[in-house]
Every structure is written in structure tokens, then in C-alpha cells.
Curated annotation (Swiss-Prot):
NCBIfam families noted in UniProt: trpB
Cofactor(s) demanded: pyridoxal 5'-phosphate
Record organism: Prochlorococcus marinus subsp. pastoris (strain CCMP1986 / NIES-2087 / MED4)
Chemical reaction(s) catalysed: (1S,2R)-1-C-(indol-3-yl)glycerol 3-phosphate + L-serine = D-glyceraldehyde 3-phosphate + L-tryptophan + H2O
Pfam families for this protein: PALP
Listed name of the protein: Tryptophan synthase beta chain
Gene symbol of the encoding locus: trpB
Pathway named in the protein's UniProt entry: Amino-acid biosynthesis; L-tryptophan biosynthesis; L-tryptophan from chorismate: step 5/5
């Protein structure tokens, strides 16, 4: 089965699956940006709309997803993990959607490739991006190298310490990595600096935003490029066990990997959608990144969504052992799905994520990224509550090579 994606296939559903013409998911989303960026956002929305109607664009994207990215990614039955979580009342069969096997090691390449093709279509030769864990930065640097585009990556100084391997990879791929020292020197601050760059260079530059956050049309565009994950998973589930899955499980920071898996299933009401946030040191402390669990409505990086903020509306610092989840906001569509009760969201601590990473590594021979480990950790809470045999699909959104130093230090492994 060859992986193909088509905007028409994804978006011929009702309002549950797409924003309004104003870029709203219910009350969330919108365009809270300087006036100088509005023409670029309109241009991007028009370019994306036209591109999805262009067979040549869609065919080129699908060809590169197959021959360059390595899609489709397997749906793998994790038999030892399934056995580990078997209870007296149910056997929860666990399947992994192996986005970690993509070129560059994570789901991020799906969106980076698609947006690079849009940038070329718009005549933009300079690309900027933000990154936390480094995977989006690596993916963006990779596609820029592939197409001969100038590439500038903004990354917080704190994340650079945690993700030195990915920093080297970006530089090796020809990207300029700009260190961000303002604020907490993490993903939020890198995003702010990237937006400042875009405001100053909007005529020549395209900003490849890495998550389903930011001003419209970014949440929609990023979601649509990642929806290939869920489209493949839906077909693979039918082939593997003859039905749709009972539960989809994914980690959530900004929320792109989760939305890519969830989106094609949103109208399938029999399928539970569960997103797992980073509880850090605990949601009752000040050191966490559980935006949906503990946040309130506010505006960040051009979009209205749930945020971690104080009573005066000031954005608070987020904390997670995972650089990719260390963000005080979340994509507006996730906030909407939570409000209407279509998706459920929980959180796990740093310690729980580390335990899950170790468990999956030992039982399946797969070292997941720290971000992904948060989704695996939710199995400890989920499986004991199930009273029947259940098919669970986890989005294995990235591999853990980038995290080995952090994990070794945290687990005291020499």
C-alpha cells in the first residue's frame, strides 16, 4: 500500500474537522499578529489551498514522502508490551505507529517537507524555523538542503545544552543555528524570535512553524501535512485486525503529532482520542507543561488557545524533561476538541516518562524519544481501567537517540 495524502480527502468533513473561514476552532485560533504579517498569512493560506488542488503538487509531495521520507511507516504490534499490560479483565493489544522510522527520526519531516514545497511555490528562498527538541530544526534543515534553500533555525540556549546532537546535525546540514538567550531560553522564546525575524523579512522569508499552533492558517496547514499519519494508521488497522482502533494515544506539547494521528479519526466517534501532556515535577507544582490540564484561555504567538498564565495574564514558564513538550501553550484545535469532549487529555511526570522509556526499550528493543515516552507512560493509568479487549494505537512520534545523555544522567546510567 502506497501512502498518499490529499487535502480533499482530509477536509470533506463537517466543521468538527476544520477551522472556520476566520481560522477559528470554536473560540480558539484566529490571527493575533502585527499588521505587517497579514499579507504573508493570506498569501500562505491561498498558496496552500491552491496547492492541494494541484495534482502536480500532490503527486510530488506523495512521491517525496515515499522515496525521501520513507513512508508509509509501519504499524507494529508490540507483543511484549501487550503482555506486560494484560489484566484479568482485558488484553489491551498495543500497536505502535512508527513515525520514529521516518527520515530524520520523527514525524516532523512530514510538515517540513510540505511547507518547503509551499515556500518554493511562493518564490521564498529563505527559510526560518523554531525548534525545542531539535527534531523540527533537523527536519527543516534537511528539506532546505534537499531543495537548496537558505535555512536559519532559532533554538533556546537551554535546549541547545539538552540537544547537542541535533544542533550538530542542523549545522552539518548547512543551517545557521541562532542561540536564543531571552526569557527561559526554551521553545517559547525560540518561537518568539523566529516570529520577530519573519516580521522583519516577510517579503523574502517563509516561516516553517513546527506545530499546530500560531496564527491561522498554520494550525490547519501543519495538521493537514501530518494527517498522513492517521490516514495510514486507519488503513493499517483495518488490514491488521479488521476494525478501527478503540483508542489512539499520543503525546501533546504544541500537538502536531497527536493532531496528525487524531484528525482522520475525529468523526469516528467509537475511537477514543487521548493526548498526554508533560506534568514535569507534578501539575500541582510550578514546574510542569500541562497546558490543557491546568491552563486558561489566552493569546500566545498569534493564536488564542489554552495557556499557562498567572492571574494577570502573564505567560508562565513551562517545565519538562522533554524539550519538545516544554511549551506553555497548545494548538487551538486541541483546546477545541477538549472543550467539546471529543478528545481526552491527561499528564505524566518526568519520572513516569523516564520509567516508560526504560520499559519500552527493554521490552520492545525500541528507544522512544522522551516526548513519545509520555504517551507510553499513560498505559500505566489507562490499561487497569479497561474491562474488555482493546486495540490501542500509540503514535511513536520520534526516536530517543537525541535524549540518551539526558536519560543517562537522570537514570544514573554510566
Amino acid at each position: 500500500m502506497v501512502s498518499t495524502i490529499s487535502r480533499q480527502d482530509q477536509n470533506n468533513n463537517d466543521d468538527l474537522n476544520q477551522p472556520s473561514k476566520e481560522g477559528r476552532f470554536g473560540k480558539y485560533g484566529g490571527q493575533y499578529v502585527p499588521e505587517t504579517l497579514m499579507p504573508a498569512l493570506f498569501e500562505l493560506e491561498e498558496a496552500a489551498s491552491d496547492a492541494w488542488k494541484d495534482k502536480q503538487f500532490v503527486n510530488e509531495l506523495n512521491h517525496l514522502l515515499k522515496t525521501y521520507v520513507g513512508r508509509e511507516t509501519p504499524l507494529y504490534e508490540a507483543k511484549r508490551l501487550t503482555e506486560h499490560y494484560q489484566t484479568k479483565t482485558s488484553t489491551s493489544r498495543i500497536w505502535l505507529k512508527r513515525e520514529d522510522l521516518n527520515h530524520t527520526g520523527a514525524h516532523k519531516i512530514n510538515n517540513a517537507l510540505g511547507q518547503a514545497l509551499l515556500a518554493i511555490r511562493m518564490g521564498k528562498q529563505r527559510i526560518i524555523a523554531e525548534t525545542g527538541a531539535g527534531q523540527h530544526g533537523v527536519a527543516t534543515a534537511t528539506v532546505c538542503a534537499r531543495f537548496g534553500l537558505q535555512c536559519i533555525i532559532y533554538m533556546g540556549a537551554e535546549d541547545i545544552k539538552r540537544q547537542s546532537l541535533n544542533v550538530f546535525r542542523m549545522k552539518l546540514l548547512g543551517a545557521e543555528v541562532k542561540v536564543v538567550t531571552s526569557g527561559t531560553a526554551t521553545l517559547k522564546d525560540a518561537t518568539s524570535e523566529a516570529i520577530r525575524d519573519w516580521v522583519s523579512n516577510v517579503e523574502t522569508t517563509h516561516y516553517i512553524l513546527g506545530s499546530v499552533a500560531g496564527p491561522h492558517p498554520f494550525p490547519m496547514i501543519v495538521r493537514d501535512f501530518h494527517a498522513v499519519i492517521g490516514e495510514e494508521a486507519k488503513k493499517q488497522c483495518l488490514e491488521s485486525f479488521g476494525s478501527l482502533p478503540d483508542i489512539l494515544l499520543a503525546c501533546v506539547g504544541g500537538g502536531s503529532n497527536a493532531m496528525g494521528l487524531f484528525h482522520p479519526f475525529v468523526k469516528e466517534k467509537s475511537v477514543r482520542l487521548i493526548g498526554v501532556e508533560a506534568a514535569g515535577s507534578g501539575v500541582n507544582t510550578e514546574k510542569h507543561a500541562a497546558t490543557i490540564t491546568k491552563g486558561s484561555v489566552g493569546i500566545l504567538h498569534g493564536s488564542m488557545s489554552l495557556l499557562l498564565q498567572d492571574k494577570d495574564g502573564q505567560v508562565q514558564e513551562a517545565h519538562s524533561i522533554s524539550a519538545g513538550l516544554d511549551y506553555p501553550g497548545v494548538g487551538p484545535e486541541h483546546s477545541y476538541l477538549k472543550d467539546i469532549g471529543r478528545a481526552e487529555y491527561g499528564s505524566v511526570t518526568d519520572a513516569e516518562a523516564l520509567d516508560a522509556l526504560k520499559l519500552v526499550s527493554e521490552l520492545e528493543g525500541i528507544i522512544p524519544a522522551l516526548e513519545t515516552a509520555h504517551a507510553f507512560a499513560w498505559l500505566e493509568k489507562l490499561c487497569p481501567t479497561l474491562d474488555k479487549d482493546t486495540e490501542i494505537v500509540i503514535n511513536c512520534s520520534g526516536r530517543g537517540d537525541k535524549d540518551v545523555n539526558t536519560v543517562a544522567s537522570s537514570l544514573n546510567i554510566d
